[in-house]
Curated annotation (Swiss-Prot):
Top EC category: translocase
Subunit structure, as described in the record: Forms homooligomers; most probably hexamers. Interacts with XpsL/GspL.
CDD domains hit by this protein: PulE-GspE-like (cd01129)
EC number: 7.4.2.8
Protein localization: Cell inner membrane
Catalysed reaction, written as an equation: ATP + H2O + cellular proteinSide 1 = ADP + phosphate + cellular proteinSide 2
Protein name as annotated: Type II secretion system protein E
Organism placement in taxonomy: Bacteria, Pseudomonadati, Pseudomonadota, Gammaproteobacteria, Lysobacterales
């Protein structure tokens, strides 16, 4: 009865904290009778509750400490005599791990602290009172392997049981059989799960002669993960291609696909791209978390002193507003946030995207399909006959698309789009280089926003220090803070943020078109002159915006320099 009571309280807490949906709970209860599993175990198995949410809620409801098993080394403390009575199979089955003895009590780290059967069994086997602490299931399983097993990680255990035969890769049926083996399925699932735990935006799976390299892009920086051996290359790549509904027999041409799945309670949309390389197909999976994305300018890092000016340009009834920056700089998220602000019942919004990354209620979103002739330009021609107020084009890729967008702006539509340029002034010169007439640009461009993403400091643990005279002079910090002592921040590694950074924030510069800039465009002024005139009119560069954030402890000067050196 006590176990059920604890489970009930934990489930109720998960619902209250919105870490579990009512519909998912109903679904799990329907399956519970058939499976014979406990409710919380089933919720985890179905991916309806993430490991972290499960552990944090258990710790909070039961009043137990939450621990990070990754902080412990690979060598266990001196083995307790009493622990010898606990089999490795028992530890794995119940996801618990003794880590030492404290004040006559056995320090037991456990994933399911409501499991009275397992806890009583440990107490009886060891004859010791227990000190319970809660950890994530996968982290405790890894710890068990490292300490009480053969020192293998979860991936290492899977790899040992997996079969791979490079010589059979020309046989499509053999390849399909390899990809359908349970160890290969678990291996691919583990890679995706690890990406979710790391908050990665992309997974890179790259075949080489001796191994299959796995890397994750976390906060814009690639981090290498555990790599399976090269013998599993064909099986792993084929498994991903099967999940993405791609042709596993075609290995000479690039392919694009999509995987929809649920991982740790999150609905994930993975965009899959494959390209042939010397040692096999390289795969990149972009992770889109539809449930946690928030279209809020403040949460993106836009400052209160900047937003009024940006919104004023955004709310103009017609014209063109561009967002520029390299791939992965957050342009699409900024445009989606702008659209969500403009999305009211009295406005019709139509977008053309490749691909449609997030779906927004009330907005007509068109997926471009160049392979059947539905490119940006052709879609735009049809859109203007749909009586829209606002049009969003995923990217101005060519002169034809740019000219139709400009014509739409001239006929009373507000057009939002993106360009790949390094700074805001570069947006004007890029359109001129495309062949757009200068008088059309001056008549339609309202503003150009350039942006980058910098890693955000884990401010609670960052090291604050007084800036040296050399730093103050080199970065001209007195221009931003004329008075008082100037402080900067350094990242400090923690279990939650191994690099000292946690998430990313935006740094921006916003060029607002005015009469002086229009005259400069008409006389074909260079990018440098256009930027000088924009700064004279009040534009703050991305570099300056980044320095301001560094002074506030949001990021570091090193991060700002890393992303703005070409701006």
């Amino acid at each position: 009865m006590e176990q059920r009571s604890a489970e009930t309280r934990i489930v109720e807490a998960l619902l209250e904290r919105r870490r579990l949906k009512d519909t998912d709970l109903v679904r799990a209860r329907q399956l519970q009778a058939e499976s014979g599993m406990g409710l919380l175990a089933l919720l985890g198995r179905l991916g309806l509750v993430s490991e972290r949410d499960h552990a944090e809620t258990c710790a909070e409801v039961l009043g137990l400490p939450l621990v990070d098993a990754r902080q412990l080394g690979d060598t266990p403390p001196e083995m307790l005599p009493e622990v010898q009575g606990l089999s490795l199979r028992f530890l794995k089955q119940f996801h618990l791990c003794p880590v030492g003895e404290r004040d006559g009590r056995l320090d037991l780290w456990i994933a399911d602290p409501y499991d009275d059967y397992a806890i009583d069994a440990v107490r009886l086997a060891t004859g010791l009172p227990l000190l319970l602490q809660v950890g994530l299931r996968s982290e405790i399983d890894d710890l068990i392997e490292r300490w009480y097993g053969q020192g293998r990680s979860a991936m290492g255990t899977i790899v040992e049981t997996a079969d791979g035969d490079a010589s059979s890769t020309d046989d499509i049926e053999a390849l399909r059989d390899l990809a359908s083996e349970a160890p290969v399925i678990r291996l691919v699932n583990l890679v995706i799960q690890h990406a979710v735990e790391l908050r990665a935006s992309d997974i890179h799976i790259e075949p080489f002669e001796s191994r299959l390299k796995v890397r994750y892009r976390v906060d814009g920086v690639l981090v290498e993960g555990e790599s399976p051996p090269a013998k599993l290359t064909a099986a792993v790549i084929s498994r991903i291609k099967i999940m993405a509904k791609l042709n596993i027999a075609e290995r000479r041409l690039p392919q694009d696909g999509r995987i929809m799945l649920r991982v740790q309670g999150k609905e994930l949309d993975l965009r899959v791209s494959t390209v042939p390389t010397a040692h096999g197909e390289s795969v990149v999976m972009r992770l889109l978390d539809r449930e946690t994305v928030v279209f809020d300018f403040y949460k993106l890092g836009f400052t209160e002193d900047f937003l009024p000016q940006f919104r004023k340009v955004l709310e103009q009834p017609h014209g063109i507003m561009l967002v520029t920056g390299p791939t992965g700089s957050g342009k699409t998220t900024t445009l989606y946030t702008a659209l969500s602000q403009l999305n009211t019942s009295d406005v019709k919004i139509i977008t053309v995207e490749d691909p449609v990354e997030y779906q927004i209620e009330g907005i007509n979103q068109i997926q471009a399909k160049p392979q059947i002739g539905l490119d940006f330009a052709n879609a735009l021609r049809s859109i203007v006959r749909q009586d829209p107020d606002i049009i969003m084009i995923g990217e101005m890729r060519d002169l034809e698309t740019a000219r139709i967008a400009i014509q739409s702006a001239l006929t009373g539509h507000l057009v939002l789009s993106t360009l790949h340029t390094n700074n805001a002034a570069g947006g004007i010169t890029r359109l001129l280089d495309m062949g757009v007439e200068d008088y059309l640009l001056t008549s339609t461009i309202n503003g150009i926003l350039a942006q980058r993403l910098v890693r955000k400091l884990d401010l609670a643990n960052a090291e604050r220090y007084a800036a040296s005279p050399e730093e103050i002079e080199r970065f001209d910090l007195r221009r931003l803070q004329p008075d008082g002592e100037i402080f900067l921040y350094r990242p400090r590694a923690t279990a939650a943020a191994p690099t000292g950074y946690l998430g990313r924030t935006t740094i921006v510069e916003f060029l607002v078109m005015n009469d002086e800039l229009r005259r400069a465009v008409m006389r074909r002024a260079g990018m440098g002159e256009i930027e000088q005139l924009a700064r004279k009119s009040g534009m703050r560069t991305m570099y300056e915006d980044g320095l301001s954030k560094a002074l506030r402890g949001e990021t570091t000067i090193e991060e700002v320099l890393r992303v703005t050196e070409d701006a």
